[in-house]
Amino acid sequence: MLSYFYRELCMSVIELTQSNFDETITNNEIVIIDFWAPWCGPCLQFAPTFKETSEKVEGVTFTKINTEEEQALGAHFRIRSIPTLMIFREGIGIFSQPGSLSGKDLEDLLEKAKTINMDEVKKEVENQ
């Protein structure tokens, strides 16, 4: 019942799977991912905040990954705690943090993600 509630609440949020992950990350400039599970109380509590923010913030693709159904993606990103938020910009991971945020903090974080100098980020990635 709670996972149904979560799914209904996040209708405007794209559900990522192994089959659409690469395409979604590649075809959208900024993508935020909410790693969650249907049994996770804090994940279910965060769902309304995530959805409300998705309706306010423009230029960001809001997505979620059910770590129970997409265990390979959770393992690939070494998700150890949920919820975990991750942001990609221009296909590069620029933020990852376990835990949820308030709506205001989430909006501020996404606005900051829009202003990051990606030329500098790409240089850092090349030097690794």
Show the residue positions of the predicted features:
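Structural cue for short, hydrophobic secondary-structure segments
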Residues: 34-36, 87
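Short, Lys/Arg-enriched N-terminal segments with co-localized hydrophobic residues
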Residues: 1-10
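Short acidic DE-rich linear segments
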Residues: 119-128
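Non-catalytic, surface beta->alpha helical segment in thiol-disulfide oxidoreductase systems
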Residues: 89-120
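Short pre-active-site segment immediately N-terminal to redox-active cysteine/selenocysteine motifs
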Residues: 29, 36-39, 81
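Structural micro-motif
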Residues: 71, 77-86
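A short beta-strand-turn-helix
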Residues: 13-30, 71
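Conserved helix-turn-beta segment immediately C-terminal to the redox Cys motif
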Residues: 28-32, 45-65
